């Protein structure tokens, strides 16, 4: 069986930056304890488990404001997905030390939205309902930012403002965004369009669209809550025409998916640790459908190998 290692795949710079920021916080004795992450720093349970070993507590819940109310003291880290101005304000009111690990691409979209709001625009925001990135973006001004996820949501809009802009969550399928933006343009011909798919997401989706065509099946390594991982599986099926399965790690591979495959493509979400993906690739490369001894799927990657290394200041 041939394994097609789709390139590029895995970590993006925004994820690595967020993890380094959180790791440095764990190593900084001057920061007040406990140290909390407001939601998952990135959408990968292996990463949050690794941070738990470093003494950083991940708090999750329906929304960021609700989670914040659970924190009485210490330090709070805002995740790569960004937060609303209201969350930042409330954290300061509670006297918490805050560390912002928002992805620069998300920050760029927030600034664009803020500028357009100041110029009198209403915003149509294409995003996944219940995902923290749209929560943070819509939270800038819930009265004038309108979240849509499907063309049907666009149909239900009733906006009178002549000043309209449409933009999007950075990790959406670029094909879905294009379809929904076309629907918005059809309904509101005067709308300004700002496509904000981040470059890392775009390149990974395009790689799957092209390279997965040759495969019998695609394995996407990524957490079930990772939107960009789920979109890679969607791209494989809808654009490349190749059946795809998303797995958190090697233990979730079903032998029935691969036992008759001649070519298996592998990619990984932007928040998937490289050692977790490597373990999947190693398993597939040694897999023999006729030898059950090669079918064992056990995750052996230690948690301390999950997080990126950080430079520590040498004592003088």
Curated annotation (Swiss-Prot):
Isopentenyl diphosphate binds at residues 43, 81, 131, 226, 228, 271. Dimethylallyl diphosphate binds at residues 43, 81, 131, 226, 228, 271. InterPro entries: LytB/IspH. Its cofactor is [4Fe-4S] cluster. Binds 1 [4Fe-4S] cluster per subunit. Pathway: Isoprenoid biosynthesis; dimethylallyl diphosphate biosynthesis; dimethylallyl diphosphate from (2E)-4-hydroxy-3-methylbutenyl diphosphate: step 1/1; Isoprenoid biosynthesis; isopentenyl diphosphate biosynthesis via DXP pathway; isopentenyl diphosphate from 1-deoxy-D-xylulose 5-phosphate: step 6/6. GO terms for molecular function: 4 iron, 4 sulfur cluster binding; 4-hydroxy-3-methylbut-2-enyl diphosphate reductase activity; metal ion binding. The active site is at 133 (proton donor). [4Fe-4S] cluster binds at residues 12, 103, 198. The keyword 4Fe-4S applies. One of its GO terms (biological process) is isopentenyl diphosphate biosynthetic process, methylerythritol 4-phosphate pathway. It catalyses: isopentenyl diphosphate + 2 oxidized [2Fe-2S]-[ferredoxin] + H2O = (2E)-4-hydroxy-3-methylbut-2-enyl diphosphate + 2 reduced [2Fe-2S]-[ferredoxin] + 2 H(+); dimethylallyl diphosphate + 2 oxidized [2Fe-2S]-[ferredoxin] + H2O = (2E)-4-hydroxy-3-methylbut-2-enyl diphosphate + 2 reduced [2Fe-2S]-[ferredoxin] + 2 H(+). Keywords: 4Fe-4S, Iron, Iron-sulfur, Isoprene biosynthesis, Metal-binding, Oxidoreductase. It comes from the Bacteria. Pfam families: LYTB. Its EC number is 1.17.7.4. Catalyzes the conversion of 1-hydroxy-2-methyl-2-(E)-butenyl 4-diphosphate (HMBPP) into a mixture of isopentenyl diphosphate (IPP) and dimethylallyl diphosphate (DMAPP). Acts in the terminal step of the DOXP/MEP pathway for isoprenoid precursor biosynthesis. Belongs to the IspH family. This is 4-hydroxy-3-methylbut-2-enyl diphosphate reductase. It comes from Geobacillus thermodenitrificans (strain NG80-2).
